Amino acid sequence: MKILGIDTSCDDTSAAIVEDGKNVLSSVLSSSIDAHKEFQGVVPEIAARKHLEAILYVIDKALKDANTTLDDIDLFAVTNRPGLLGSLLVGVASAKSLAFSLNKPLLALDHIAAHIYSPHLTNDIEFPYIALVVSGGHTIITEVHDYGEYKVVGTTLDDAVGEAYDKVSKFLNLGYPGGPIIDRLAKEGNKEAIKYPIVLLNGIDEFNFSYSGLKTACVYSTKKYLKEGYEATNENIAAAFQISAIEPLYIKTLKYAEKSGIKRVTLSGGVACNSYLRDRFGNSKDFECYLPALKYTTDNAAMVAGLAYHMKDKQNFADYNLDCFSRVLNKKYNKNKSAK
């Protein structure tokens, strides 16, 4: 079965064709990141306009790269939640137009569930497992027992980890997006030269995260370090920041693995391309970790089309009333049953 997936949840416009859930025939992405650099973050209005400019191109290229025509597509799939509403509308409108004009079925999927699926594209993973989703908009620990179904165990109470990277990079005038820049600088830095706090919440928040304090500490502590003559170079700041940003992810994931007895863990989301994070989890002796290929860490439509193959018999197909949502329909437990 050939499925054409579309994702326009944030600032990347993507289309992909996947056969039988795992055989990626094509995966095309158009990034609008250059248009957002001067603003040091994603501007929703600009993102939506860039999607309009790119959507037909990425769909057409995905078909050509897969040596496939629209008539060969058995099912269309699109993310309709969560994300920027203006961005989501472009993908949903395009998918609806294609599906209904060709009289083909359409599935609406959860963007988070698609990220959770991304390691499945290159790994054979047994259920249950713990999925850590880390990006500029999300920092979530979930327990996964089946495709498209996940229970949120912990989330961020303020900034997402990727957002913290961007804000620290902005403070240091390093550029946007901050994640790749800080990751690169950290490799040249001394993580022991300066220290930032590792924030670990307890009690009812034992599996939740907080990154606003780390961001503030980087701003004020760095100024203090510079005054007191510490080696607060950009490289050392980046190395110290990475430790404080990544360690809570590992510690809390391990803590939930021990509590639940689940010893399989997956990483997904844009921050999953971070080299220190991949090494920390990938080399773990505490649990078995499955990593997505680097090309499937950021937003992409291959993960959408792949998940759709497994969801086609589990949820209703979408109709003309398909809408978009900025948030996950049910924060605590998502079963993908209500896609409309």
Swiss-Prot record:
InterPro entries (alphabetical): ATPase_NBD, Gcp-like_dom, KAE1/TsaD, Peptidase_M22_CS, TsaD
The protein's required cofactors: Fe(2+)
Cofactor note: Binds 1 Fe(2+) ion per subunit.
Main location: cytoplasm
Keywords, comma-separated and alphabetical: Acyltransferase, Cytoplasm, Iron, Metal-binding, Transferase, tRNA processing
Chemical reaction(s) catalysed: L-threonylcarbamoyladenylate + adenosine(37) in tRNA = N(6)-L-threonylcarbamoyladenosine(37) in tRNA + AMP + H(+)
The protein's enzyme class: transferase
Binding site for substrate: V133, V134, S135, G136, G137, D166, G179, D183, N274
Keyword Membrane: no
GO molecular function: iron ion binding; N(6)-L-threonylcarbamoyladenine synthase activity
Pfam families per the UniProt record, alphabetical: TsaD
GO biological process, one term: tRNA threonylcarbamoyladenosine modification
Keyword Ubl conjugation listed: no
Top-level taxonomic group: Bacteria
Role noted for this protein: Required for the formation of a threonylcarbamoyl group on adenosine at position 37 (t(6)A37) in tRNAs that read codons beginning with adenine. Is involved in the transfer of the threonylcarbamoyl moiety of threonylcarbamoyl-AMP (TC-AMP) to the N6 group of A37, together with TsaE and TsaB. TsaD likely plays a direct catalytic role in this reaction.
Recorded family membership: Belongs to the KAE1 / TsaD family.
Protein name: tRNA N6-adenosine threonylcarbamoyltransferase
Species assigned in the record: Brachyspira hyodysenteriae (strain ATCC 49526 / WA1)
Lineage: Bacteria, Pseudomonadati, Spirochaetota, Spirochaetia, Brachyspirales
The gene coding this protein: tsaD
